[in-house]
Protein backbone atom coordinates (compact mmCIF):
# COMPACT_ATOMS: atom_id res chain seq x y z
CA UNK A 1 0.00 0.00 0.00
CA UNK A 2 1.39 3.44 -0.94
CA UNK A 3 2.17 6.09 1.69
CA UNK A 4 -0.61 8.35 0.40
CA UNK A 5 -3.19 5.57 0.59
CA UNK A 6 -2.00 4.58 4.05
CA UNK A 7 -2.56 8.14 5.26
CA UNK A 8 -6.27 7.62 4.52
CA UNK A 9 -6.14 5.02 7.29
CA UNK A 10 -4.89 5.95 10.75
CA UNK A 11 -4.80 4.34 14.19
CA UNK A 12 -5.65 5.75 17.61
CA UNK A 13 -4.30 4.11 20.76
CA UNK A 14 -6.28 5.48 23.67
CA UNK A 15 -9.79 6.96 23.58
CA UNK A 16 -10.07 9.42 26.44
CA UNK A 17 -11.17 13.00 25.87
CA UNK A 18 -8.30 13.79 23.50
CA UNK A 19 -8.16 10.38 21.82
CA UNK A 20 -11.90 10.39 21.13
CA UNK A 21 -11.63 13.95 19.84
CA UNK A 22 -8.97 12.86 17.34
CA UNK A 23 -11.16 9.96 16.24
CA UNK A 24 -14.09 12.29 15.59
CA UNK A 25 -11.91 14.80 13.72
CA UNK A 26 -10.53 12.18 11.34
CA UNK A 27 -13.82 10.33 10.83
CA UNK A 28 -15.64 13.58 9.99
CA UNK A 29 -12.98 14.31 7.36
CA UNK A 30 -13.19 11.02 5.52
CA UNK A 31 -10.27 9.19 7.17
CA UNK A 32 -10.69 5.59 8.36
CA UNK A 33 -9.70 5.03 12.00
CA UNK A 34 -8.63 1.86 13.80
CA UNK A 35 -9.01 2.12 17.58
CA UNK A 36 -7.36 0.30 20.46
CA UNK A 37 -9.09 1.27 23.69
CA UNK A 38 -9.21 -1.60 26.17
CA UNK A 39 -10.84 0.38 28.98
CA UNK A 40 -14.47 -0.17 30.06
CA UNK A 41 -17.17 1.67 28.08
CA UNK A 42 -14.63 2.83 25.49
CA UNK A 43 -16.99 2.32 22.56
CA UNK A 44 -19.78 4.16 24.37
CA UNK A 45 -17.46 7.09 25.12
CA UNK A 46 -16.21 7.31 21.53
CA UNK A 47 -19.72 7.10 20.08
CA UNK A 48 -20.86 9.88 22.40
CA UNK A 49 -18.01 12.09 21.17
CA UNK A 50 -18.91 11.29 17.56
CA UNK A 51 -22.49 12.34 18.27
CA UNK A 52 -21.32 15.60 19.84
CA UNK A 53 -19.13 16.30 16.81
CA UNK A 54 -22.03 15.63 14.46
CA UNK A 55 -24.24 18.10 16.32
CA UNK A 56 -21.49 20.73 16.45
CA UNK A 57 -20.71 20.52 12.72
CA UNK A 58 -24.40 20.67 11.82
CA UNK A 59 -24.75 23.90 13.81
CA UNK A 60 -21.60 25.46 12.35
CA UNK A 61 -22.25 24.98 8.64
CA UNK A 62 -24.79 23.88 6.06
CA UNK A 63 -22.11 23.15 3.46
CA UNK A 64 -22.15 19.50 2.35
CA UNK A 65 -19.46 17.62 4.23
CA UNK A 66 -17.11 14.87 3.16
CA UNK A 67 -18.18 11.27 3.29
CA UNK A 68 -17.29 10.01 6.74
CA UNK A 69 -14.45 7.60 7.32
CA UNK A 70 -14.96 4.14 8.75
CA UNK A 71 -14.34 3.25 12.36
CA UNK A 72 -13.04 -0.06 13.68
CA UNK A 73 -12.45 -1.14 17.28
CA UNK A 74 -9.61 -3.65 17.51
CA UNK A 75 -8.67 -6.11 20.24
CA UNK A 76 -4.90 -5.59 20.06
CA UNK A 77 -2.35 -2.96 19.15
CA UNK A 78 -1.02 -5.35 16.50
CA UNK A 79 -4.36 -5.35 14.64
CA UNK A 80 -4.84 -1.62 15.20
CA UNK A 81 -1.62 -0.42 13.57
CA UNK A 82 -1.63 -2.74 10.55
CA UNK A 83 -1.57 -0.91 7.17
CA UNK A 84 -1.99 2.61 8.56
CA UNK A 85 -0.01 5.75 7.76
CA UNK A 86 -0.20 7.36 11.20
CA UNK A 87 -0.54 6.11 14.78
CA UNK A 88 -1.77 8.59 17.40
CA UNK A 89 -0.96 7.76 21.03
CA UNK A 90 -3.26 9.32 23.64
CA UNK A 91 -2.52 7.28 26.77
CA UNK A 92 -1.84 8.61 30.32
CA UNK A 93 0.94 11.20 30.73
CA UNK A 94 3.61 8.85 32.01
CA UNK A 95 6.78 8.34 30.00
CA UNK A 96 7.16 4.66 30.92
CA UNK A 97 3.60 3.86 29.82
CA UNK A 98 4.00 5.71 26.54
CA UNK A 99 7.35 4.10 25.73
CA UNK A 100 5.89 0.65 26.39
CA UNK A 101 3.08 1.43 23.95
CA UNK A 102 5.56 2.68 21.32
CA UNK A 103 7.58 -0.53 21.59
CA UNK A 104 4.49 -2.58 20.78
CA UNK A 105 3.45 -0.20 17.99
CA UNK A 106 6.88 -0.44 16.35
CA UNK A 107 6.81 -4.20 16.58
CA UNK A 108 3.72 -4.39 14.38
CA UNK A 109 3.50 -1.27 12.16
CA UNK A 110 5.28 -0.57 8.87
CA UNK A 111 8.65 1.18 8.95
CA UNK A 112 7.17 4.16 7.10
CA UNK A 113 4.29 4.67 9.56
CA UNK A 114 4.40 7.95 11.48
CA UNK A 115 4.02 7.75 15.26
CA UNK A 116 2.82 10.74 17.27
CA UNK A 117 1.92 11.55 20.85
CA UNK A 118 -0.88 13.86 21.99
CA UNK A 119 1.09 14.79 25.12
CA UNK A 120 0.56 18.31 26.39
CA UNK A 121 4.07 18.78 27.68
CA UNK A 122 6.48 15.83 27.66
CA UNK A 123 9.52 16.49 25.50
CA UNK A 124 9.51 14.46 22.27
CA UNK A 125 13.22 13.64 22.59
CA UNK A 126 12.49 11.84 25.84
CA UNK A 127 9.57 9.94 24.36
CA UNK A 128 11.45 8.83 21.24
CA UNK A 129 14.74 7.80 22.89
CA UNK A 130 13.92 4.05 22.93
CA UNK A 131 12.38 3.84 19.46
CA UNK A 132 14.08 1.77 16.76
CA UNK A 133 13.16 4.42 14.18
CA UNK A 134 12.94 7.69 16.14
CA UNK A 135 13.03 9.79 12.97
CA UNK A 136 9.33 9.06 12.32
CA UNK A 137 8.19 10.22 15.78
CA UNK A 138 6.87 13.66 16.78
CA UNK A 139 4.41 15.31 19.16
CA UNK A 140 1.10 16.55 17.76
CA UNK A 141 -0.49 18.55 20.59
CA UNK A 142 -4.17 19.42 19.95
CA UNK A 143 -6.70 21.42 21.93
CA UNK A 144 -10.02 20.28 23.35
CA UNK A 145 -12.44 19.73 21.70
CA UNK A 146 -10.14 18.37 19.02
CA UNK A 147 -12.96 17.97 16.50
CA UNK A 148 -13.65 21.73 16.64
CA UNK A 149 -10.45 23.62 17.49
CA UNK A 150 -8.09 23.75 14.49
CA UNK A 151 -4.75 24.46 16.20
CA UNK A 152 -2.22 21.65 16.56
CA UNK A 153 1.35 22.16 17.74
CA UNK A 154 3.88 19.97 15.92
CA UNK A 155 7.01 19.40 17.98
CA UNK A 156 9.92 17.32 16.72
CA UNK A 157 12.53 15.71 18.92
CA UNK A 158 16.28 15.38 18.54
CA UNK A 159 15.94 12.60 15.96
CA UNK A 160 12.73 13.64 14.17
CA UNK A 161 13.26 14.05 10.42
CA UNK A 162 12.14 17.02 8.33
CA UNK A 163 10.20 14.58 6.15
CA UNK A 164 8.18 13.49 9.18
CA UNK A 165 7.35 17.10 10.08
CA UNK A 166 6.32 17.84 6.48
CA UNK A 167 4.09 14.76 6.29
CA UNK A 168 2.52 15.58 9.64
CA UNK A 169 1.63 19.08 8.43
CA UNK A 170 -0.01 17.69 5.30
CA UNK A 171 -2.09 15.23 7.34
CA UNK A 172 -3.43 17.94 9.64
CA UNK A 173 -4.14 20.33 6.78
CA UNK A 174 -6.06 17.52 5.07
CA UNK A 175 -8.46 17.39 8.06
CA UNK A 176 -8.93 21.16 8.30
CA UNK A 177 -6.46 21.88 11.08
CA UNK A 178 -3.94 24.71 11.43
CA UNK A 179 -0.54 23.18 12.27
CA UNK A 180 2.18 25.28 13.88
CA UNK A 181 5.70 23.81 13.98
CA UNK A 182 7.41 24.64 17.27
CA UNK A 183 11.03 25.31 16.33
CA UNK A 184 12.62 24.15 19.59
CA UNK A 185 11.57 21.74 22.31
CA UNK A 186 10.26 23.40 25.46
CA UNK A 187 8.18 22.02 28.31
CA UNK A 188 4.43 22.59 27.79
CA UNK A 189 5.22 23.89 24.27
CA UNK A 190 3.82 27.33 23.33
CA UNK A 191 0.04 27.68 23.66
CA UNK A 192 -0.22 26.16 27.14
CA UNK A 193 2.59 28.41 28.37
CA UNK A 194 0.62 31.43 27.19
CA UNK A 195 -2.53 30.11 28.87
CA UNK A 196 -0.61 29.54 32.10
CA UNK A 197 0.61 33.15 32.05
CA UNK A 198 -2.95 34.43 31.58
CA UNK A 199 -4.16 32.10 34.35
CA UNK A 200 -1.54 33.38 36.82
CA UNK A 201 -2.35 37.02 36.08
CA UNK A 202 -6.10 36.31 36.31
CA UNK A 203 -5.70 34.86 39.80
CA UNK A 204 -3.91 38.00 40.98
CA UNK A 205 -6.52 40.32 39.43
CA UNK A 206 -9.34 38.46 41.17
CA UNK A 207 -7.47 38.17 44.48
CA UNK A 208 -6.76 41.92 44.55
CA UNK A 209 -10.38 42.76 43.77
CA UNK A 210 -9.61 44.37 40.42
CA UNK A 211 -12.37 42.45 38.63
CA UNK A 212 -14.62 39.42 38.98
CA UNK A 213 -14.30 36.07 37.21
CA UNK A 214 -17.34 36.92 35.08
CA UNK A 215 -15.78 40.24 34.05
CA UNK A 216 -12.50 38.52 33.18
CA UNK A 217 -14.42 36.06 31.04
CA UNK A 218 -16.16 38.91 29.24
CA UNK A 219 -12.86 40.74 28.69
CA UNK A 220 -11.46 37.69 26.91
CA UNK A 221 -14.64 36.81 24.99
CA UNK A 222 -15.41 40.32 23.76
CA UNK A 223 -11.84 41.62 23.52
CA UNK A 224 -8.59 39.99 22.47
CA UNK A 225 -10.22 36.55 22.33
CA UNK A 226 -11.99 37.64 19.14
CA UNK A 227 -8.82 38.67 17.31
Predicted regions and their residues:
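A non-catalytic, amphipathic alpha-helix used as a structural packing/dimerization or gating element
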Residues: 44-52, 97, 163-174, 215-218, ...
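NAD(P)+-binding Rossmann beta1-loop-alpha1 motif at the extreme N-terminus of oxidoreductases
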Residues: 1-56
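Rossmann-like NAD(P)-binding element
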Residues: 40-41, 57-114, 122
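Rossmann-fold dinucleotide-binding core
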Residues: 117-184, 188
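Structural motif
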Residues: 13, 36, 74, 90, ...
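Helical "substrate-binding/catalytic lid" subdomain
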Residues: 185-227
Amino acid sequence: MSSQLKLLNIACVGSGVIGAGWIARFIENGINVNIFAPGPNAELSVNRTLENAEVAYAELTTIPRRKKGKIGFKKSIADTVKNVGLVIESVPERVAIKQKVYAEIEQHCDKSTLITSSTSGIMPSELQEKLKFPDRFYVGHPFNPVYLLPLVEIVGGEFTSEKTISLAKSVYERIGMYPIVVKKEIEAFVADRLLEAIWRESLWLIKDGICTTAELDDIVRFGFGLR
